[in-house]
Swiss-Prot record:
It is a single-pass membrane protein. It is found in: Host membrane. Residues 1-26 are annotated as: Disordered. This is Uncharacterized gene 28 protein. Its main location: host cell.
Length: 98
């Protein structure tokens, strides 16, 4: 006993439309492609977040960390005040007051 695909015919005025029901499931390749694409997006998101944190840490280290302290010490040894104009009053030194 063989079954053939079911066709539905609709006739209105002068138009005849024949519709055949589609397959109920997609091929597994569609699911695999969707999963691989979402994994790729997730990996790229992780890389971007790690890069952002790395750049932020470099900024903080150069602004407030050891590098900034060395720059301040070198500037004080040379007698230069970093980021200040000549007319401003003296600023707080990084050294302990006497």
């Amino acid at each position: 006993m063989t079954t053939s695909p079911t066709t539905i015919s609709t006739t209105t005025a002068a138009t005849t439309t024949t519709t055949t029901p589609g397959k109920g499931t997609d091929s597994p390749m569609v699911y695999i492609e969707a999963m691989l694409f979402s994994m790729l997006v997730l990996i790229l998101l992780i890389i971007v977040c790690a890069g952002y944190v790395h750049v932020k840490n470099l900024y903080y280290r150069s602004r407030y960390g050891v590098t900034a302290i060395y720059q301040q010490v070198e500037a004080e040894c040379r007698g230069v005040s970093l980021g200040r104009s000549v007319d401003e009053p003296p600023y707080q030194s990084i050294y302990m007051p006497d």
